[in-house]
Amino acid sequence: RSLQIFGKKLPLFTGLPSALKELKEYVSTNPSFYTSHVTLDIYIISGGFEEVIRASKLSPFIDGIFGCTFAYESSSSQPIGIKSAISFTEKTRFLHGIRKGIDPLTLRTDPYRVNDAIAPHMQRIPFSRMIYIGDGPSDIPCLSPVVSGGGVGVGVSAPFGTFKKGYELAQGKRITVGPYTANYKKGSDMRKVLDEALLRMGLAIYIDRKKNVIT
């Protein structure tokens, strides 16, 4: 209960949660994207508590949340321990599950499903169609395959964050752009990058699907 109360009051970065709604509308109202069935799914893979995120104002615009969870006492519904913690290894597992189209519940209850062999053309969201936003070293194992797979890795830092984290992200071509200050408001550098990345990816999907229909 206290986690849910905290989640409802969770302070968010500038521009959130309205930016999530606007980005989804940006994709859904583009005629070319609509005719080629291009959609935007938004996932959160976080070392924070899942219940807090689910209770936050972000939740209505999120398609999947992967975070730390508690084990509860059955009679009192009180937390009695940590059920799952999210390390950089877990972040990578969930990322590959999203790529392969394995639903969040299955990834939780049957973790070995992430090892299923999926042909490239059967991947639900290939790395080349991902935009991964990371803010620290634990995101590097996820940023690297996304960027090397043709997707976009965006480095972000909190307004009160340190330069060190951004510097670590930028080493070894782990990110495509950034790091930017976590400002998602229209007109900000971060928002311009996201708008451009969505436009380019959407048009690439549109052209690819149109080509396949013609051939």
Task: Walk through the language-model features, giving the residues of each.
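Short glycine/proline- and acidic residue-enriched helix-loop micro-motifs
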Residues: R1-G7
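C-terminal cap/substrate-recognition subdomain and adjoining C-terminal extension
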Residues: G7-T215
